[in-house]
């Protein structure tokens, strides 16, 4: 009998449990290995085990207690996670300046359909961050650089086989105007309204 899905309101992508090494493996829905993994928290020296399903985490092999690195995706407890390194390696060519402090971390897919999978993680423009570190320096430079890190909406585009990172509001509008012009944002701030993006994903996914 199929297991009943927990009624927790969280999106679950239909991928067999396991680790996917490459884009092709992921698209075929054939995991390369089904070794058991644990999700652990990003912050903290001990990297505690996570009881709940989190949007961002590290994954560790249960049998060796070593961190899962250099893979494309993991299907874990019914949830699909992309590795941050894979997102940055398979992104749209216009998204090159985006970076993240935890390339081996995993990001959970929050929504999706036949066209797109949607996720969110904290990214920063590495050129702007480098300027903050180098131009100001010291503690002020650190806080300025940290402050430049924003939660970004990201989609996996099945048709183009790439991730598209919504770097800023104008970048998001360039993407959405071709697909759903009614969802273009007014860009009162540099970053787009993430709540509005989530509603749009519900329409275009």
Residues covered by each model-derived region:
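C-terminal partner/receptor-binding element of secreted or periplasmic proteins
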Residues: 173-205
